[in-house]
């Protein structure tokens, strides 16, 4: 007999503003508990040092978390110049101290080097795996393993300020970009070394900065609900973004009610007007209810790829 899921069936996305000093998984578990969700997942971890946007997918929204993981990100970063650390951030040990002697022109020239399409060798202090183990576990044991340079794109790299030995930048980049590595490489290019002392993720995909909520805000709403003898969901659920926002950049295909039953059973249905081999966002009927994503083929058939399960929330515990 299958074990019944704990928590309620709730689908949506929370834009969490993660605080510094906590792991992304800790933040995820807190959000899951506040919403009493049966399932939750985040869309790309932030280092404990980092703050900012951490989209948390609840319920069926977890089926589309990969699309947010693959999306562009934006960061505000402050680097301390003149010191290099073994982790490329302030959590590590200082391994080298050098004078700061570059000119403004040299700084601007160095920044230009990182814009556009480049190759980046990931830090040893990352969650990437080598022979089944995260790189940071090797690093903690003093073992360096080979890492291949990976293609990344820096769409924008904006100079914000240079105050004393602290340099602040705004970086819009592709998935898989390590900001700590950019700062470490920049410090070496400038000849003085550098490491991250503040890192804040300000954007994931298209999600707006002003929609973020903190754990403290969620906790306060739960406390208010308990004080007023309300179900916490009555206050929390209004913060959820629809799960189809994770694939909002996909073109929509609306399937008529007459074909809906076939589609929801996993069968391809005939539609027209879209390019083949393209992922699409599927809605049903006149209500345009989101039910998943699919792919068009050359014959005008829409094949479902990931469909959501429609639950009766009244039966969830």
UniProtKB/Swiss-Prot annotation:
Responsible for synthesis of pseudouridine from uracil-55 in the psi GC loop of transfer RNAs. The active site is at 47 (nucleophile). It is an enzyme of class 5 (isomerase). This is tRNA pseudouridine synthase B. The keyword Iron does not apply. Belongs to the pseudouridine synthase TruB family. Type 1 subfamily. Its EC number is 5.4.99.25. Keywords: Isomerase, tRNA processing. It comes from Shewanella sp. (strain MR-4). The keyword tRNA processing applies. The lineage of its organism: Bacteria, Pseudomonadati, Pseudomonadota, Gammaproteobacteria, Alteromonadales. GO terms for biological process: mRNA pseudouridine synthesis; tRNA pseudouridine synthesis. GO terms for molecular function: RNA binding; tRNA pseudouridine(55) synthase activity. Disulfide bonds: none annotated. It catalyses: uridine(55) in tRNA = pseudouridine(55) in tRNA. The gene is truB. PANTHER family: PSEUDOURIDYLATE SYNTHASE TRUB1, TRNA-PSEUDOURIDINE SYNTHASE.
